[in-house]
Amino acid sequence: MTSVVVVGTQWGDEGKGKITDFLSADAEVIARYQGGDNAGHTIVIDGKKFKLHLIPSGIFFPEKVSVIGNGMVVNPKSLVEELDYLHQEGVATDNLRISDRAHIILPYHIKLDQLQEASKGDNKIGTTNKGIGPAYMDKAARVGIRIADLLDKDIFAERLKANLAEKNRLFEKMYESSPVAFDTIFDEYYAYGQKIKDYVTDTSVILNKALDKGRRVLFEGAQGVMLDIDQGTYPFVTSSNPVAGGVTIGSGVGPSKINKVVGVCKAYTSRVGDGPFPTELFDQTGERIREVGHEYGTTTGRPRRVGWFDSVVMRHSRRVSGITNLSLNCIDVLSGLDIVKICVAYDLDGKRIDHYPASLEQLKRCKPIYEELPGWSEDITGVRSLEDLPENARNYVRRVSELVGVRISTFSVGPDRDQTNILESVWGL
């Protein structure tokens, strides 16, 4: 039995899709365990980009099983659109399995998301307006609708009516907005359910059987540790648990069956939306990194905030997710800089701290303490081994590993699959 979890260690957009796609080559089952279509991942195959939001990266391997786990919140409309997109691109989806326990996102969740965000004014949290938070709210409040319910016409109608009665009171009384009509949702979304029903099953059974048979299972996280609702920069977080521990809840697989955790990070840092970002750059260096790194959100299209690599963030992620291996991406983006910086600690009111504070007020006062390293000018996009990197780039990679306290198992020098270099196989192959 071998299982590997892939988690983002920063604020998402670290290149998890690419690394998952890369590791999928040796996996037999690939599963997502949290989030929804608020997270996008881009996979490049033979120079062609595929952008997915719900379906696991393993879908491009027809001989492997791809799983949408129970911890996800699924917009049936988005899922059907994504399936249609893959079919149009000639990608088969017969290997997809969808948990009957996953909750669904409906139009009233999206409307509530938008109204709540607009009402916050300057205190907005930067939601993607995809209805993710309200769907997880319904799940926690025990009024959510699951995929199993969506497939039963009578149950779906009953629960939809009950939810709309509550939501429409909220829309009309609190937000002074128009109600959502039952007829605008029911037929359309029941039809979506019928389109996906052949994929729906108890995915916990599939995953545990695979592990018990010694098959290699890869768990694919969305967002990143710093967006985790418990361990991230609350309240500027997502509504689920991207940390590795979220696997057990979101997939129905026990913690004793998890072997390795691969933390994915960039050689710098990026963030979409509001919230603390101690190493953020506002100068020409930041603009250069944004443009060279094409730092625009897959889901929102918004320019990402960028900054230097933050080892304080990374050590926090290592600790709360139990990271055993590191995958360092986008080293090539830093090529051409005379000096590259790594944040090694924070200065908080004149005191050096090595941990990431929970208090937003303290974070506002934190100043990064940097270590400067000499940069490199060479084009490294064709490098295929650590030894072939320029000395300064090689030293940068080693210093990142030292500061985080985790060995690097892969590093990448570009977006393509063949630009990912293995230092150590996490599968033990």
Curated annotation (Swiss-Prot):
Pathway linked to the protein: Purine metabolism; AMP biosynthesis via de novo pathway; AMP from IMP: step 1/2
Binding site residues for IMP: D13, E14, G15, K16, N38, A39, G40, H41, T128, R142, Q223, T238, R302
InterPro entries with a match to the protein in the record: Adenylosuccin_syn_GTP-bd (IPR018220), Adenylosuccin_syn_Lys_AS (IPR033128), Adenylosuccinate_synth_dom1 (IPR042109), Adenylosuccinate_synth_dom2 (IPR042110), Adenylosuccinate_synth_dom3 (IPR042111), Adenylosuccinate_synthetase (IPR001114), P-loop_NTPase (IPR027417)
Subcellular location: Cytoplasm
Residues at which Mg(2+) binds: D13, G40
Reaction equations catalysed: IMP + L-aspartate + GTP = N(6)-(1,2-dicarboxyethyl)-AMP + GDP + phosphate + 2 H(+)
Binding site for GTP: 12-18, 40-42, 304, 330-332, 412-414
Principal location listed in the UniProt entry: cytoplasm
Binding-site residues, substrate: T298, T299, T300, G301, R302, P303, R304
Needed co-factor(s): Mg(2+)
Keywords: Cytoplasm, GTP-binding, Ligase, Magnesium, Metal-binding, Nucleotide-binding, Purine biosynthesis
EC numbers: 6.3.4.4
Gene Ontology MF annotations: adenylosuccinate synthase activity; GTP binding; magnesium ion binding
Family from the record: Belongs to the adenylosuccinate synthetase family.
NCBIfam families from the UniProt entry: PRK01117.1 (NF002223), purA (TIGR00184)
The protein, known as: Adenylosuccinate synthetase
